[in-house]
Amino acid sequence: MAQGSHQIDFQVLHDLRQKFPEVPEVVVSRCMLQNNNNLDACCAVLSQESTRYLYGEGDLNFSDESGISGLRNHMTSLNLDLQSQNVYHHGREGSRVNGSRTLTHSVSDGQLQGGQSNNELFQQEPQTAPAQVPQGFNVFGMPSTSGASNSTPHLGFHLGSKGTSNLSQQTPRFNPIMVTLAPNIQTGRSTPTSLHIHGVPPPVLNSPQGNSIYIRPYITTPSGAARQTQQHSGWVSQFNPVNPQQAYQPSQPGPWTTYPASNPLPHTSTQQPNQQGHQTSHVYMPISSPTTPQPPTVHSSASSQSSAHSQYNIQNISTGPRKNQIEIKLEPPQRNSSSKLRSSGPRTASTSSLVNSQTLNRNQPTVYIAASPPSTDEMISRSQPKVYISANASTGDEQGMRNQPTLFISTNSGASAASRNMSGQVSMGPAFIHHHPPKSRVLGGNSAASPRVVVTQPNTKYTFKITVSPNKPPAVSPGVVSPTFELTNLLNHPDHYVETETIQHLTDPTLAHVDRVSEARKLSMGSDDAAYTQALLVHQKARMERLQRELEMQKKKLDKLKSEVNEMENSLTRRRLKRSNSMSQIPSLEEMQQLRSCNRQLQIDIDCLTKEIDLFQARGPHFNPSAIHNFYDNIGFVGPVPPKPKDQRSTIKAPKTQDTEDEEGAQWNCTACTFLNHPALIRCEQCEMPRHF
């Protein structure tokens, strides 16, 4: 790739890859070369490219091979419909499923190699396919690694087949697709929660494969012990069905050890009339790469079931720790017509999987898990467990079998979970899931619907569901944020897991005996599940009642608060009205002038009274201010005063008096009565008028 060029600044490349994870690394490298490692210029260009790659407008066709044509528009619409190999469907028809963003592509793990030959694409391996596999058909292929990053919530896929005109109907191309989950996923509301794959290839008549899903864990460390003949002991015809449990009992159970849900039978075929409800199969696969000594395989060996709860087997859920695992639950559709049941042969204990064995119809999915050594391409990503999901038309043609459209899911795990088992440690690599359409048997006009594959991750906050449905749009599965296994499907849909029909056994007494033992075991496990479910329901009902009581108390408190708020609002309204009324009583301008004149007059009166009080205090306590105004009323006779008779004594003393007056000063004249007073007097002798008024 462009990383090998000495002109690229790897620090800038790393920053741009972190900032624009949805843009392929080839585009980022080319942009850096064009802009001479200028970070700002590259950000400006990649911000435009990011929108294209986010919303399905970019070009992911990094290879000219026609087999990669299904990866256009960032795996928005993965049409692998094998009936229309000669027609190229546009890839954007499913780009807005559930309002989701599309999965973006990354070539960090290498370019997509769709042009490999059949010999390069499918490596030779031990017998890991069902017994009816045609000669030379290898169920599991080994595609080169490819990458995608930043899966977003509610990712919608339409799994149908895209082909080109140069491909024939009998030889569909093997289109590997890899979806990589970012290792730094943060917990939050925007955490990726679900992955939908819709559109299963239609059933093919007289197909020996049936509707099957194959899960194949790859071993990154080649080991002879890992390639034991015990891996494919379920497919050999020399298998002894009398004691089938020997293949499932490891000497030392580890975290990834699996126990069968029922007694497996090598290729039993039973009748189940009027089968209703859903049959489910569960596969738990590790998200983080576990370390197990030998990776044997487990096949969903299925015999008949009749328990009301046996079809929802959760008894193996608590077997060992399931941290960082993916659960793949297979729920076939409802089918009322009677059909034959096919059960696959038993396998050994799973390396990193937990399979609940189910009675599987030919029109219902089966799960197969096989182990195989890795290739040179897989040695690069040995710490990343991967899941390959492919849909095959099962036409019976060997070349058509080998060219299988495949979906490759890779989860980047930070640390690998260690587990102890019988021998050394082996890091588990990818696993394959091959989906094979069943034989189409139409009885009475009833046709089989498509199965649904749900992939979840228990004991974590992320849930990934893969739904396969060709006839209806994808359902919203937002994921379950819970640290424990969820029983919501069982509680919310109890009718889907009820089966009361009787089972017709084969004439072989040995097989019938093993079948009855399996049914008895499933009945006991189903009763345990029913008891646990009943206890859980009682607990949930008690919790619901307590929450209802708390809700009533909160409602009463809310009503009380509402009444108080209303009372306070009414009081505030009254105060505002009162204030507005007082503001309306402001006096006019004329009234203000009158009040001002009154205030001035009052101030004058106050000053006069103050002076009178001071005068009263100066004259003494006997001062009568009212007497000042009527002084002349009481003055008496105002005529001339007759002269007094002259006396000798008075004439002699007169000059002496004149001298005393000159010495004391001039007499002062009263302003009220004009009486001459002595200079020493401050008041008039006649009228008591002050000298200085």
Swiss-Prot record:
<feature type="compositionally biased region" description="Polar residues">
    <location>
        <begin position="334"/>
        <end position="361"/>
    </location>
</feature>
<feature type="modified residue" description="Asymmetric dimethylarginine">
    <location>
        <position position="173"/>
    </location>
</feature>
<feature type="region of interest" description="Interaction with polyubiquitin">
    <location>
        <begin position="675"/>
        <end position="685"/>
    </location>
</feature>
<dbReference type="InterPro" id="IPR036443">
    <property type="entry name" value="Znf_RanBP2_sf"/>
</dbReference>
<dbReference type="GO" id="GO:0007507">
    <property type="term" value="P:heart development"/>
</dbReference>
<keyword id="KW-0862">Zinc</keyword>
<feature type="compositionally biased region" description="Polar residues">
    <location>
        <begin position="97"/>
        <end position="117"/>
    </location>
</feature>
<feature type="region of interest" description="Disordered">
    <location>
        <begin position="330"/>
        <end position="361"/>
    </location>
</feature>
<keyword id="KW-0488">Methylation</keyword>
<feature type="region of interest" description="Disordered">
    <location>
        <begin position="564"/>
        <end position="583"/>
    </location>
</feature>
<dbReference type="GO" id="GO:0043130">
    <property type="term" value="F:ubiquitin binding"/>
</dbReference>
<feature type="cross-link" description="Glycyl lysine isopeptide (Lys-Gly) (interchain with G-Cter in ubiquitin)">
    <location>
        <position position="611"/>
    </location>
</feature>
<feature type="region of interest" description="Disordered">
    <location>
        <begin position="640"/>
        <end position="663"/>
    </location>
</feature>
<feature type="modified residue" description="Phosphoserine">
    <location>
        <position position="450"/>
    </location>
</feature>
<dbReference type="GO" id="GO:0005765">
    <property type="term" value="C:lysosomal membrane"/>
</dbReference>
<keyword id="KW-1017">Isopeptide bond</keyword>
<dbReference type="Pfam" id="PF02845">
    <property type="entry name" value="CUE"/>
</dbReference>
<dbReference type="InterPro" id="IPR003892">
    <property type="entry name" value="CUE"/>
</dbReference>
<feature type="zinc finger region" description="RanBP2-type">
    <location>
        <begin position="663"/>
        <end position="693"/>
    </location>
</feature>
<keyword id="KW-0863">Zinc-finger</keyword>
<feature type="region of interest" description="Disordered">
    <location>
        <begin position="90"/>
        <end position="117"/>
    </location>
</feature>
<dbReference type="GO" id="GO:0043123">
    <property type="term" value="P:positive regulation of canonical NF-kappaB signal transduction"/>
</dbReference>
<keyword id="KW-0597">Phosphoprotein</keyword>
<dbReference type="GO" id="GO:0045860">
    <property type="term" value="P:positive regulation of protein kinase activity"/>
</dbReference>
<keyword id="KW-0479">Metal-binding</keyword>
<feature type="coiled-coil region">
    <location>
        <begin position="532"/>
        <end position="619"/>
    </location>
</feature>
<feature type="modified residue" description="Phosphoserine">
    <location>
        <position position="524"/>
    </location>
</feature>
<dbReference type="InterPro" id="IPR041911">
    <property type="entry name" value="TAB2/3_CUE"/>
</dbReference>
<feature type="compositionally biased region" description="Polar residues">
    <location>
        <begin position="224"/>
        <end position="282"/>
    </location>
</feature>
<dbReference type="GO" id="GO:0008270">
    <property type="term" value="F:zinc ion binding"/>
</dbReference>
<keyword id="KW-0175">Coiled coil</keyword>
<keyword id="KW-0472">Membrane</keyword>
<feature type="modified residue" description="Phosphoserine">
    <location>
        <position position="482"/>
    </location>
</feature>
<comment type="function">
    <text>Adapter required to activate the JNK and NF-kappa-B signaling pathways through the specific recognition of 'Lys-63'-linked polyubiquitin chains by its RanBP2-type zinc finger (NZF). Acts as an adapter linking MAP3K7/TAK1 and TRAF6 to 'Lys-63'-linked polyubiquitin chains.</text>
</comment>
<feature type="domain" description="CUE">
    <location>
        <begin position="8"/>
        <end position="51"/>
    </location>
</feature>
<keyword id="KW-0967">Endosome</keyword>
<feature type="modified residue" description="Phosphoserine">
    <location>
        <position position="582"/>
    </location>
</feature>
<dbReference type="GO" id="GO:0005737">
    <property type="term" value="C:cytoplasm"/>
</dbReference>
<feature type="modified residue" description="Phosphoserine">
    <location>
        <position position="372"/>
    </location>
</feature>
<keyword id="KW-0832">Ubl conjugation</keyword>
<feature type="cross-link" description="Glycyl lysine isopeptide (Lys-Gly) (interchain with G-Cter in SUMO)">
    <location>
        <position position="562"/>
    </location>
</feature>
<dbReference type="GO" id="GO:0060090">
    <property type="term" value="F:molecular adaptor activity"/>
</dbReference>
